């Protein structure tokens, strides 16, 4: 909760609030899971595949009308340069001492239009369709949508505080974010987020 409160305050201090879209380009792991939750508690998250090329980042950041991009400090990504060219604020996630802890650096002081914690009707997450039959389209999911999905998955799997989920799924995709991370945490369980499956 401290991480979430600190993240919301940091975002609000640089003009990012509820329903403002924040693209997240981070490797799979505890920091990505924690960033999704903490940023989503006060803004709209838009996780993107870290393996995208510059032209793909250009499309997604433009289509999203992203207000900021979160990348991990010291990790190379073409997203940084693309965001700078588009005038999108680049925030660097600095991992903390413990798994999943972090701080955000960067951005300029500004007033958030809708500061504070997200409400049930606010958009928590935006994803794009696959684009197999047409140009990818944005799919917005509200706080209430993703919480209901996580609760239903947790109930279906009979998850409890005694459970631990080993997540190997990408955390820029709905299944990893909701079916693994949020459903487990929502049930009081634990999540171990690996860098991926090899």
What is each residue range found by the language model?
Residues 1-9, 120, 139-160, 168, ...:
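Conserved structural elements of the adenylate-forming
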Residues 7-52:
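Conserved AMP-binding/adenylate-forming
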Residues 13-14, 41-117:
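Structural core segment of the AMP-binding/adenylate-forming
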Residues 14, 20, 55, 67, ...:
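Structural detector for helix-capping/boundary residues
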Residues 26-37, 51-55, 168-186:
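Conserved coil-to-alpha-helix start sites within the AMP-binding
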Residues 40-41, 147-164, 174-198:
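Conserved AMP-binding/adenylation subdomain of ANL enzymes
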Residues 97, 109-128, 134-135, 143, ...:
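Conserved pre-ATP/AMP-binding loop-to-beta segment of ANL
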């Amino acid at each position: 909760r401290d991480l979430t409160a600190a993240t919301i305050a940091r975002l609000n201090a640089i003009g990012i609030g509820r329903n403002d879209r924040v693209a997240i380009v981070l490797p799979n792991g505890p920091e990505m899971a924690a960033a999704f939750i903490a940023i989503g508690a006060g803004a709209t998250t838009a996780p993107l595949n870290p393996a995208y090329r510059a032209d793909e980042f250009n499309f997604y950041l433009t289509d999203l009308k992203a207000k900021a991009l979160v990348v991990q400090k010291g990790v190379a990504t073409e997203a940084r340069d693309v965001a700078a060219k588009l005038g999108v604020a680049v925030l660097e996630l600095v991992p903390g001492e413990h798994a999943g802890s972090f701080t955000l650096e960067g951005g300029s002081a500004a007033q958030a239009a809708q500061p504070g914690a997200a409400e049930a009707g606010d958009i928590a997450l935006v994803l794009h369709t696959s684009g197999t039959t047409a140009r990818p389209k944005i799919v917005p999911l509200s706080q209430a949508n993703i919480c209901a999905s996580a609760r239903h998955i947790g109930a279906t799997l009979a998850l409890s505080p005694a459970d631990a989920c080993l997540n190997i799924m990408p955390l820029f995709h709905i299944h990893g974010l909701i079916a693994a991370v949020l459903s487990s945490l929502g049930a009081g369980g634990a999540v171990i987020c690996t860098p991926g499956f090899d």
